[in-house]
Amino acid sequence: MKGMREKTLKSLEFDKIVKLIANECDSELGREKVFDIEIKKDLKAIEFELDLLNEAVKFIYSYGDISFSFQDIREHVKKAQIDYILYNRELLGIKNFLSLVEEVKAHFKSLYDREDFLLLKEFDKRLVPLKSLKEKIENTVISEDEISDEASPVLKAIRRQKASINEKIKSTLNSIISTRQKELQEPIITMRQGRYVVPVKQEYRNVFKGIIHDQSSTGATLFIEPIQVVDLNNELRELELKEQKEIERILFELSQEVKKNAEAIFKDVEVVSELDFLFAKARYSIKIKASRPELNTSGYVNLKKARHPLIDPEKVVPIDIHIGREFTTLVITGPNTGGKTVTLKTVGLLTLMAMAGINIPAEEKSQISIFEDVFVDIGDEQSIEQSLSTFSSHMTNIVSILKKVNKNSLVLLDELGAGTDPLEGSALAMSILDFLHRTGCRTIATTHYSELKQYALKTKGVENASVEFDVETLRPTYRLIIGIPGRSNAFEISRRLGLSEEIIENAKSYMSGEAIRFEDVIKDVEEKRKDLENAYQEVERLKKEVEVLKEELEKEKRKLESQKDKILKEAKEKAREIIKEAKQTAEEVIKRIKEAEEKEKNKDRAIQEIREKIKKNLEELEEEVLKPKEFSYGKIPDSLKAGQTVYIVPLDQNGIVLSPPDASGNVEVQAGILKMTVHISNLRVKEEQEQEEVKKGYSRFINEKAKSISPSLDVRGMTLDDALLEVEKYIDDAYLAGLNQVTIIHGRGTGVLRTGIAKFLRNSKYVKSFRLGRYGEGGDGVTIVELHSR
C-alpha cells in the first residue's frame, strides 16, 4: 500500500479492505499487486481505474467470471534465459500458463463487437498467445515424471528396443523361476540397483550362477542376477543412459524455445496478474454491493446510504452525510457507542477506497472529493469495537496534524478534547476547530461536550450533527441527523431506568437555566424533526404507490397496444399465408394437369379415343349445365341453396352453388374444374321461368356424377399431401353426387395417412361423422365417412 501514511491506513482499517480484495485473487502475483495498491491523488488516474473496474464488473454480470489461477513461472523463464535445462514440472507450469492466456483470449472474444468494453479490449490486445510453444510442450511432456514417446524418433526407437529387451529378460527369468523353484525363496522377479534379480536361498548361493546385488536383513535370501540375463541387463542399462541423454537433449531444445519467447511470456504474466487484481476488485465490489462514486476536487463529500464495509451487512445502519458546501466543519455529538466513530471511519474509509479506484458501498451518485491528505485521530491502532486513546496520545497526534494540514486535507477527529478536564478540554477543542476552519480543510469531529454544540451553532461554516438515540428502547439507532446537535438524554434515560422524579428535578436545579433551556430547545427541535420526517416518509410512501399504479397503468396500456399490433400483424401474416397456399395449390393443380396430359399422350390409341369421347361428352354437359344460352340476370340474390346456377360477375362465367351463404355472405361455388368462395354480392340469379330449365340440367349433371363416383377411394401408397388432395376432391364429388356414406382405404402402415385424413375430415363441412372400419369392413385400415344430405 502506498500513497498515504501508514497510520491513516491502519486507523481507518484500509489494510483490512486490501486483505479482503487479496482473498478474491486467484494467483500469488495478483495478490502481490493488491498489497501494492496505491492511493492516487490525480483525478484522471482515479477515473481511469474506476472505468476499468466497472468494465470488469459489467463483464462478470454479462459473461460470467474468469479464473486467473496460475503459478509464478518467472523464475523458470529466467533459468531458460541463461541456458539452464527446464525439467518436466517447470515446463508444465509454463504450458499451463500459456493455456490460461488462450482461455482468457477466448473469454474476451465476445467483446470484439462491443463498444462499451474498450479498456478490457486493450488488455486483450496486450496478451500474446504462444500456441506453438504450448503445443510443443504439450506434445512432449506428459507428466512430471514422463516424456512422450513421440517427443523424437530417436527416443521412440530407444524405448522400442528397451521394451524388446525387457521382454527377453522377463521371459528368461520366468523360465528360470519355473525350472529352479527349489532354489528360490519366492517365485518372483524384482529389481536391485536398476537390474533384474531373483530371491535365492542362502544355501544355494554356490549352485545358482550369477551376480549377487543384495541380501535380506536376516541373510537368508540373496538377490542374484542370473548369469543368463547379465548381458541383457547390461544392454538395457546402456539403452537407459541413451534414453536419458535423448530426453535431456529434447528438454534443452524446449528450454531454448522458452528462451526465445521469454519477453512475450513476461509481458503475458504481467497482463494476467493485472487482470487477476482487477477482477478481484470487481468480485469484491459485487460482494459488498458497491457502486461507482462521482469524484470531484472541490472538497465536497456527499454519501447516500453509506455502509461501513467491515460491519456485518445484516447489522450495519446506512448513513447519509455531506460536507464541503454550506459548511466545511461538522461537529457530531451524541452518546458513547452511538455510532459517532463508525461515521468518522465510514467517511474516511470510503474516501480512501475511492482514491484507490475501488467502488464504495453507498448508493449511486454518492460523491467523494479527492484530497491531498487524510488525517485521522481515532486512537492508537483503534478498531471500531475498542478505544485505547488517552489525552496525551490524542494531543501528540493532533499537534502533528496541525503542522501538516492544508485546505485540500480531510481531517477526522474522534472525541476531540476528551481525557482531561471538561472545561479545558472543550476550550482546546473549540480552539483546534477554529484553526482547522481557518485553513479551509474539511473537518469532521465527534464530541460529547455541550459547549461544542453551541460553538457549532454560533460559528459560520460549522454545522452540528447528532447520532439518533431511541429513548423508548434506550438504544442508539446509529442514524446520523445533520443540522441538529445531540442531547445527552441523561435525565430521560435515568427516568426510564426508574430513578425518582424528585432526584431528577433536584439534579436539574444544579444546572444553569440557560443549559436547561438549551436542552429543552434541542428536545423540541428533535421532536418536530421526527414529526416532519414521519410526514415526509408518508408522502414518499404515497408517491411510490402512485408511481407503482402509474407504472401498472402504463404497462397495461403497452400490453393492449402490443396485443393490437400483434393481432394486426398475425392477421396480415395469415392473409399472406392463405394467398401463398392458394397460389401453391393452383400451381400444384396446373402441374398435375400437365403431368396427366403428358402421360395421356403416351397411352395407346384406344385410350386416346375414349378420352376424346369423354371430353366431348363433358363439353356437351358443361355447355348444357354451366354455360346455357344467354339469360337475363336479375338482382343480387336474397338467398341461395346448393344446386342453384348463378352468374359469377367478376369471372363473367356461370357456376353451381355448392353450399348456402355463411354468416358473412360468402358462398362456395363450382365453376368448371375450379372451386372457389365468392361473396353473394358478386352473384346474380336467373329469371324464375328459366331457372327450372337450369335445375333440370343440374340434375342431369348430378346424376351423371353419381354414376361415375365410386363408393370408396383407395389412397394406399400415396404421400400424405397427395392423399389429402385426392380425399378432398373425392368428398366434394361424393357430396355433389348425393352419396350418404363412402369408404376411404388408407391401409394400416405407420398410421400417418389415417391420422392426417382424420384431421382433414374433422374440419370438412360436408362430413357429418366418420369412424374406423369394423370387423368385415376393413378394420382400422379404412375410414367410414357419413356425409351431410344436400
UniProtKB/Swiss-Prot annotation:
ATP binds at G334, P335, N336, T337, G338, G339, K340, T341. PANTHER family: OS10G0509000 PROTEIN, OS10G0509000 PROTEIN-RELATED. Belongs to the DNA mismatch repair MutS family. MutS2 subfamily. Pfam families: MSSS, MutS_V, Smr. This is Endonuclease MutS2. It comes from Caldanaerobacter subterraneus subsp. tengcongensis (strain DSM 15242 / JCM 11007 / NBRC 100824 / MB4). Keywords: ATP-binding, DNA-binding, Endonuclease, Hydrolase, Nuclease, Nucleotide-binding, RNA-binding, rRNA-binding. Residues 713-788 form the Smr domain.
